[in-house]
A protein has these predicted regions:
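Conserved, carboxylate-rich catalytic/transport cores that coordinate ions
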Residues: 1-197, 201, 205
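Hydrophobic alpha-helical segments, chiefly the membrane-spanning helices
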Residues: 209-213
Length: 213
C-alpha cells in the first residue's frame, strides 16, 4: 500500500511493476470517488484499531490504523466488483444471493426522530429515511464528542445486513444491487456467488468443481 501511495503522489514512471495499470486504476479511482459522492453512502468512518501487547499479553497501547488512498482504492474496487457480480447474475436470470441491508424499521425511525436535531434530517414525507439524511445528521454535530454520539445513535438505528434471494438493495451503501463476491470472510453463501459466475462463464468447469465441493 505504501509503495502504491508513493507512486500516486510522485507520479514516478516505471518504478513499480505494472505502472501503466496503476496509472489507469488511479484514473478509475477518481471516477469512483465522484460516483460515490453523488451516491452518498452512509459515512460513519469508525477507525480500525490495533492493540499492542507485551510478552505477557498485557495491553501496552491502542492505536488507530492509518489508511491512505491506496487502501480506499482497494475498497472501492471491491465494492465495484460486488456490484458487477450481482448485476451479472441477475441479468442471466439465475437465482442469486444478494447481500441486502434493509431500510430502518418505522419503530426505530420514530425513536431516532426524538434525538436532538435528528428530526430536521429526516424527510417529512412519512417515515422515509436515506443515507443522505443520516450523513446530514452527523455533519450537524457540534464538535467531535457530539459527532461520535450521533454516530453511535445511528448504529442503533440500522438494521443488520443479511443474505437474501430477494433484491431489496443495500441501505448503507445506497445501492440497488449488491452481493459478497470479494468478501474476505468466505461464508458458504459467498462461495455460491463464485459458483454462479463460473456456471455463467465456464459451465464445464463448474461440473469439475462440483465433484470436489
Amino acid at each position: 500500500y505504501e509503495d502504491v501511495e508513493i507512486f500516486r503522489l510522485e507520479k514516478t514512471v516505471n518504478t513499480l511493476p505494472y505502472s501503466k495499470s496503476l496509472t489507469d486504476l488511479w484514473d478509475l479511482y477518481d471516477l469512483l470517488l465522484k460516483e460515490k459522492k453523488d451516491r452518498s453512502p452512509l459515512k460513519l468512518d469508525f477507525p480500525e484499531r490495533v492493540i499492542s501487547t507485551d510478552v505477557d499479553d498485557s495491553v501496552l497501547d491502542i492505536t488507530n490504523v492509518k489508511k491512505n488512498n491506496s487502501n480506499q482504492l482497494v475498497e472501492e474496487l471491491m465494492i465495484l466488483a460486488n456490484i458487477s457480480a450481482a448485476e451479472t447474475i441477475k441479468k442471466c436470470g439465475m437465482g442469486n444471493l444478494f447481500r441486502i441491508h434493509p431500510t430502518p424499521s418505522n419503530e426505530k425511525i420514530e425513536t431516532f426522530r426524538n434525538i436532538r436535531g435528528a428530526g430536521s434530517s429526516i424527510t417529512k414525507n412519512g417515515n422515509k429515511i436515506t443515507s443522505v439524511h443520516l450523513n446530514e445528521f452527523v455533519n450537524s454535530a457540534k464538535g467531535v464528542d457530539e459527532r461520535e454520539i450521533y454516530k453511535q445513535e445511528i448504529i442503533k438505528l440500522l438494521e443488520q445486513a443479511r443474505y437474501s434471494t430477494k433484491n431489496d438493495g443495500h441501505f448503507g451503501l445506497n445501492l440497488k444491487s449488491y452481493t459478497h463476491f470479494t468478501s474476505p470472510i468466505r461464508r458458504y453463501a459467498d462461495i455460491i456467488i463464485h459458483l454462479s459466475l463460473i456456471h455463467i462463464s465456464e459451465p464445464t468447469r463448474l461440473r469439475r468443481i462440483s465433484y470436489a465441493v
